[in-house]
């Protein structure tokens, strides 16, 4: 895969906006694409962090093949989106870190209802979680200039 791609300020602002979900595409063992809607975090270094309960198909796919893509649509304008091609550069099984990641994501996605976020975090603590850090290698956006 190519070297890491830089994210311009428009793309960074779009990805950092609250309430956006990503569709993560991975590759099944037979080569078929697999998609899942996920919470994500744009990290300060321009990488993306995603988190899941371990044992699901898409985390297994990323453990086997680090290539992935994320499509992040604008919820209000179906024509506005950012598509990212990337590769996992770090798999985090450390439960202290993975649980902190999912807690931060829950609080971000439920900032308007922190009671709900805390209920989710309590449930997530009963699960073995895994985080993936994705380095972006290509960016395609369809955003207004």
Where in this protein do the model-derived segments appear?
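Charged, gly/pro-rich active-site loop segments
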Residues: 1-3, 80-145
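Short, basic/aromatic recognition patches
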Residues: 1-23
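Amphipathic coiled-coil/heptad-repeat helices and related helical stalk/stem segments
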Residues: 7-8, 55, 117
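Alpha-helix boundary recognition
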Residues: 15-16, 63-64, 125
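Alpha-helix boundary/capping residues
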Residues: 18, 65-66, 105, 109
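Short beta-strand segments
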Residues: 19-54, 62, 68-72, 81-83
